[in-house]
């Protein structure tokens, strides 16, 4: 797991939870061993904390969910991989002179199946975020992903992708290196692969940066994750010329897992631990591993032709609407 000494930034709506967690931790630190009175008091605080977390998390707005998944303690791809896979090794480079740290990948095993994994990788502290470009891949990152996916297709290995990015890097250099072309080629090629592809949105799924590794037979989305064509801030700036309208933009964009399940964009919503995946990395990883194995076993029953046809039809249905 990647660690950082940086003190986490707590969103306003999470402050009551953070304060109560601090009180519980302090009580545990100061409590003498085998003091039943103190133990009972700690248990009451713990029950109160759990109840408060359930109340807050049951009524999160879309914008609050976005702020939640942007927390530095949220598990990243490289936090999940050691807990999900039985063995793994990271592979590097696009064989064109680049090795983008904002997008990682490699090979591994899960439940006896050899797989290729690919995922966006954010940092935690400022230094690490700068090194990983805040999880925004350059063209070389998408070309590295394509190289690994072609390797998977050649050797008959299922592909697992983990989506967590505000978007692809939009700098001048990225455009000069063919950002749009790199993402477009990935989209085209992912429709042609003859192996199962399972995509999991673990945090923030933003725009083409997410789609560049987001074409799959099964799309899993963590309960509090978000998936959107543009960030609410960017949408507000474009439509209202005012980023303060991001709350309205977040509502209109339908970025939550439940909205996207209703619209047929995602297939499965994965329940997160109380307090979100950032509160319990181990439990979040356990839930995700179980779901990945389940989806993998379903998809491995299909032949190559069935996989490609179902994948194509799945995405062709997206965007359908009904007039009332």
From Swiss-Prot:
Catalytic activity: N(6)-carboxybiotinyl-L-lysyl-[protein] + acetyl-CoA = N(6)-biotinyl-L-lysyl-[protein] + malonyl-CoA
Domain CoA carboxyltransferase C-terminal: 44-298
Pathway: Lipid metabolism; malonyl-CoA biosynthesis; malonyl-CoA from acetyl-CoA: step 1/1
Any single GO CC term annotated in Swiss-Prot or TrEMBL for this entry: acetyl-CoA carboxylase complex
Keywords attached to this entry: ATP-binding, Chloroplast, Fatty acid biosynthesis, Fatty acid metabolism, Lipid biosynthesis, Lipid metabolism, Nucleotide-binding, Plastid, Transferase
Pfam family, one: ACCA
Compartment(s) of residence: Plastid, Chloroplast
Gene3D superfamilies in the cross-refs: 2-enoyl-CoA Hydratase, Chain A, domain 1
Family: Belongs to the AccA family.
Stated name of the protein: Acetyl-coenzyme A carboxylase carboxyl transferase subunit alpha
Native source organism of the sequence: Porphyra purpurea
Gene from which the chain derives: accA
């Amino acid at each position: 797991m990647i660690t950082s000494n940086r003190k986490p930034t707590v969103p306003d709506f999470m402050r009551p939870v953070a304060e109560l967690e601090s009180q519980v931790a302090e009580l545990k630190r100061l409590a003498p061993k085998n003091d039943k009175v103190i133990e009972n008091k700690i248990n009451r605080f713990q029950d109160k904390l759990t109840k408060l977390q359930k109340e807050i998390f049951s009524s999160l707005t879309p914008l609050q969910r976005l702020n939640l998944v942007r927390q530095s303690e949220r598990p990243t791809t490289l936090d999940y991989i050691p807990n999900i896979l039985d063995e793994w090794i990271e592979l590097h480079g696009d064989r064109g002179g680049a090795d983008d740290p904002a997008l990682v990948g490699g090979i591994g095993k899960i439940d006896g199946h050899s797989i290729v994994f690919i995922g966006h990788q954010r940092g935690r502290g400022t230094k690490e975020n700068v090194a990983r470009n805040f999880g925004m891949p350059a063209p070389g990152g998408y070309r590295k992903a394509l190289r690994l996916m072609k390797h998977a297709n050649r050797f008959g290995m299922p592909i697992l992708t983990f989506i967590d990015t505000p978007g692809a890097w939009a700098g001048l250099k990225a455009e000069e290196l063919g950002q749009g072309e790199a993402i477009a080629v990935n989209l085209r090629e992912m429709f042609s692969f003859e192996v199962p592809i399972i995509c999991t949105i673990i945090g923030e799924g933003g725009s083409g940066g997410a789609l560049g590794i987001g074409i799959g037979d099964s799309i899993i989305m963590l309960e509090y994750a978000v998936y959107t064509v543009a960030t609410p801030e960017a949408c507000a700036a474009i439509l209202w010329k005012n980023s303060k309208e991001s709350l309205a933009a977040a509502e209109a964009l339908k970025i939550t897992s439940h909205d996207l399940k209703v619209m047929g964009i995602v297939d499965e919503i994965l329940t997160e631990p109380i307090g979100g995946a950032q509160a319990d990395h181990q439990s979040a990883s356990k839930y995700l591993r179980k779901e990945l194995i389940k989806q993998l076993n379903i998809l491995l029953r299909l032949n190559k032709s069935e996989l490609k046809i179902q994948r194509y039809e799945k995405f062709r249905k997206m965007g359908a609407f009904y007039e009332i």
